[in-house]
């Protein structure tokens, strides 16, 4: 910074440097006395602390001007720097201090230093009226002494709190016996006053600990709360218990003193504060005190909590619903009590009516627990299962996940639901989520909602569901909790609706066939393999899929699975096991046999596929399966032999396996599907036989198939009048041997459960031209082999069915308390 350059008087012109580098002559300025020279000196960089801030002594008078010099001023703002020395003085007092005054001020500051420290650290020790000079120039900037005083103030407050705590504890300890006696007084006025005093004491930590350590006091509070009719007494007693419930010792004392029945009784109180105290105290007990759940159930707390769902206080409802979730989780009796009290309807109403995230989250948790209860499912669906679906687009991830779990649990009971196009579209979109749980739930819900519901199938296909599901399977890798429900959904979408053929082609066009064949190999478990086999069977209904499936090696792998499953069933039968239908990963090997043979049946419609099957030397196995005690296995075995017999070479190989006798026996089967296929195989095998043999066979077929009905055989025009679209099975996930109903499965997502249709229907005409395709016997009127889904009964084809043992059946993966 340029400075004034002072020259001795008479030494020539004096000049001042300016920021612009120009100099002006100040020689003509009037001479300055000593005071003015001192003030001028203070304007430049030599200005120092006079001791007011640092406490150091100095001979310079106190500074009364700014610390800014000329270089800090912007001369470009039009300021006249030539008279700057005098402009500085205009804003300040022109009073000058003598050296004596400066010394006096410094001495005063030195003498009051200890007082300033005492005032900062212990202000209560100062006498009233004493004024102590402060060194704080800026109110926003504390001095060093003030900053150092903060820890001492904290220490002082801690000491004071400790003294007060001890005083509170001593007071409470002395007062508790007397207050306990007053709470037991017969005079309700005395009881009310005592309850108020105890409530006040419970607000302080020391006395609160003293109260909770006195079982007699807590018991007296509970008795007073139970017996009084005075609302104020009830409020104070409930408030005291609420304060105690924030400590584990307090919870234990309340529990042992019988406080839970008294608190449950208060849930009927008309006073808001009493209700709040009661529900929050019960909530704390349910969360942290062992034995509280059973005590609340026995006291009738569930019924009263369900009634409280009609209130409109959002935070109160959030606590109440959380209590219901704690009580219902893992306890079937509690779920049934909530159902009987009308809980599902109220919970769905809350989901529809409010937007408070915490309330929606706690309510969705209750619905998730109730949705695994077979009795509650229909009630929730009837009340409006769309309630949870309203929040699938919510920004709260925990709420979205709970809603999805709930919908997945409910979806097997809502397979007949309609007008859910928006939900289906949202689910397809959620398949693209990065959250594994969301994708898992979305796939499971789609699997259930497309079960035996043509409208839902069409909707999912139209909103890009096929592509989304194939992409999900490709991205899921070995995560079977995702691939299995996704495969099952595709299986439903590829049969029995107007868009089925499009869906069958779409799976191929979106490169789904290679990954599906890959899923037939390890490490896939049996539930997933079973679902994939069913999907491949449906895909084989599309002629364009035959060659790709064959090229990707589907046929040899399916035959390997068939042989493995059959050998397993044979080992159990040979071992003489009492239960010949044991489960492996929740799947019966008989189901795998049925499914694989059914898939081969459909794939054998194509000539090249038939050649591959013949080359795998499995016709003898098909012949053995004709002796199976299970009608559905007999039916699919006869069906695949019927297709293989379409070629002369195949017919000869079948006859060489000695199948004539079992096939003739099956003509008399009570299962019309088995008899029909057996007749078709025998007829095709007789093509090269003498005319007499054909005539005898025709008579045998007529007498066996129509059993006395006067239906004449005509010329053998074939089985063209048997509508193959009617002969398709329902969306079988071949869980028909152990499912508890549509959608209920032992592992993996719920699937279509029709016990009759196993893997396949009676489709007798090969898609490719064969030597016998147009010369098969007319079996008379169409036999409607399409059966409605059954709710857990035996095979509608009359096959033997062993009732499911609940101990052997794995819990459905969507039916668990999560």
Curated annotation (Swiss-Prot):
Residues 1-24, 48-71, 732-818 are annotated as: Disordered. Keywords: Cell adhesion, Cytoplasm, Cytoskeleton, Repeat. SMART domains: ARM (SM00185). One of its GO terms (molecular function) is cadherin binding. GO terms for biological process: cell adhesion. PROSITE patterns: ARM_REPEAT. It comes from the Eukaryota. ARM repeats lie at residues 164-203, 248-287, 412-451, 454-495, 501-541, 543-582, 648-687. Transmembrane segments: none annotated. Its main location: cytoplasm. Coiled coil: none annotated. GO terms for cellular component: cytoplasm; cytoskeleton. Residues 1-21, 48-66 have a biased composition (Polar residues). The keyword DNA-binding does not apply. It is found in: Cytoplasm; Cytoplasm, Cytoskeleton. Binds to the cytoplasmic domain of the cell-cell adhesion molecule E-cadherin, and perhaps to other (membrane) proteins. The association of catenins to cadherins produces a complex which is linked to the actin filament network, and which seems to be of primary importance for cadherins cell-adhesion properties. PANTHER family: ARMADILLO SEGMENT POLARITY PROTEIN. This is Catenin beta. It comes from Urechis caupo (Innkeeper worm).
């Amino acid at each position: 910074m340029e400075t004034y350059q002072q020259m001795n008087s008479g030494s020539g012109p004096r000049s001042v440097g300016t920021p612009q580098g120009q100099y002006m002559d100040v020689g003509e300025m009037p001479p300055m006395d000593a005071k003015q020279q001192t003030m001028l000196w203070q304007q430049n960089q030599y200005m120092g602390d006079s001791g007011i801030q640092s406490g150091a002594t100095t001979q310079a008078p106190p500074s009364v001007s700014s610390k800014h010099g000329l270089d800090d001023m912007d001369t470009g703002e039009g300021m006249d720097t030539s008279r700057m020395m005098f402009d500085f003085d205009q804003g300040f007092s022109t009073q000058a201090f003598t050296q004596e005054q400066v010394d006096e001020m410094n001495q005063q500051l030195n003498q009051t230093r200890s007082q300033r420290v005492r005032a900062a650290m212990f202000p209560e020790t100062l006498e009233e009226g004493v004024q102590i000079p402060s060194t704080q120039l800026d109110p926003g900037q504390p001095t060093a002494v003030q900053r150092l005083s903060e820890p001492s103030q904290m220490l002082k407050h801690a000491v004071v709190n400790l003294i007060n705590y001890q005083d509170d504890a001593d007071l409470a300890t002395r007062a508790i016996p007397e207050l306990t006696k007053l709470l037991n007084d017969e005079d309700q006025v005395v009881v009310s006053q005592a309850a108020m005093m105890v409530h006040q004491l419970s607000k302080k930590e020391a006395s609160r600990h003293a109260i909770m350590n006195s079982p007699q006091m807590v018991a007296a509070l509970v008795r007073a709360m139970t017996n009084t009719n005075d609302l104020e007494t009830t409020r104070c007693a409930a408030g005291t218990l609420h304060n105690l419930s924030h400590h584990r010792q307090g919870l234990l004392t309340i529990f042992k003193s019988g406080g839970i029945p008294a608190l449950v009784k208060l849930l009927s109180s008309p006073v808001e504060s009493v209700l709040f105290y009661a529900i929050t105290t019960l909530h704390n007990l349910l969360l942290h005190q062992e034995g509280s759940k059973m005590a609340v159930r026995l006291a009738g707390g569930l019924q009263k909590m369900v009634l409280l769902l009609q209130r409109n206080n959002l935070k109160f409802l959030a606590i109440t619903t959380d209590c219901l979730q704690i009580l219902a989780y893992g306890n079937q009796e509690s779920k049934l009590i909530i159902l009987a009290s009308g809980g599902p309807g109220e919970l769905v109403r809350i989901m529809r009516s409010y937007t408070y995230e915490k309330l929606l989250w706690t309510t969705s948790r209750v619905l998730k627990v109730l949705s695994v209860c077979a009795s509650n499912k229909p009630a929730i669906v009837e009340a409006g299962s769309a309630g949870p679906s309203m929040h699938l687009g919510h920004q709260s991830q925990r709420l979205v996940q709970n809603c999805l779990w709930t919908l997945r649990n409910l979806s097997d009971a809502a397979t007949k639901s309609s007008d859910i196009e928006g939900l289906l579209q949202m689910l397809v979109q959620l398949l693209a989520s990065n959250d594994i749980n969301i994708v898992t739930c979305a796939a499971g819900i789609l699997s259930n909602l497309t079960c035996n519901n043509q409208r839902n199938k069409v909707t999912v296909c139209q909103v890009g569901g096929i592509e989304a599901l194939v992409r999900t399977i490709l991205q899921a890798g070995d995560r079977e909790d995702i691939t299995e429900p996704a495969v099952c959904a595709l299986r439903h979408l590829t049969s029995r609706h107007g868009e089925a053929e499009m869906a069958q082609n779409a799976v191929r066009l979106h490169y789904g066939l290679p990954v599906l064949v890959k899923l037939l190999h390890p490490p896939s478990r049996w539930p997933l393999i079973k679902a994939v086999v069913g999907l491949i069977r449906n895909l084989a209904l599309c002629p364009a899929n035959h060659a790709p499936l064959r090229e990707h090696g589907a046929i040899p792998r399916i035959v390997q699975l068939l042989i493995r499953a059959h050998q397993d069933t044979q080992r159990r039968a040979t071992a003489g096991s009492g239960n010949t239908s044991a489960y492996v990963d929740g799947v019966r090997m008989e189901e795998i046999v049925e499914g694989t043979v059914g898939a081969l049946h459909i794939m054998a419609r194509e000539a090249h596929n038939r050649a591959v099957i013949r080359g795998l030397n499995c016709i003898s196995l098909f012949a053995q399966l004709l002796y199976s005690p299970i009608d559905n296995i007999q039916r699919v075995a006869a069906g695949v032999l019927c297709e293989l017999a379409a070629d002369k070479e195949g017919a000869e190989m079948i006859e060489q396996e000695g199948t004539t006798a079992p096939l003739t026996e099956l003509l008399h089967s009570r299962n019309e599907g088995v008899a029909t296929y057996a007749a078709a195989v025998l007829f095709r095998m007789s093509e090269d036989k003498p005319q007499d043999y054909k005539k005898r066979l025709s008579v045998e077929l007529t007498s066996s198939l129509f059993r006395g009905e006067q239906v004449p055989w005509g010329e053998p025009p074939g089985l063209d009048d048997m509508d193959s679209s009617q002969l398709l099975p329902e969306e079988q996930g071949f869980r028909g041997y152990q499912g508890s109903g549509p959608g209920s499965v032992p592992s993996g997502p719920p699937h279509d459960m029709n016990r009759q249709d196993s893997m396949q229907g009676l489709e007798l005409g090969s898609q490719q031209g064969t030597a016998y395709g147009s010369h098969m016997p007319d079996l008379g009127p169409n036999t409607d082999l399409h059966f409605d889904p059954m709710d857990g009964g035996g095979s509608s084809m009359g096959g033997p069915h062993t009732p499911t043992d609940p101990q052997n059946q794995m819990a459905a993966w969507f039916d668990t308390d999560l």
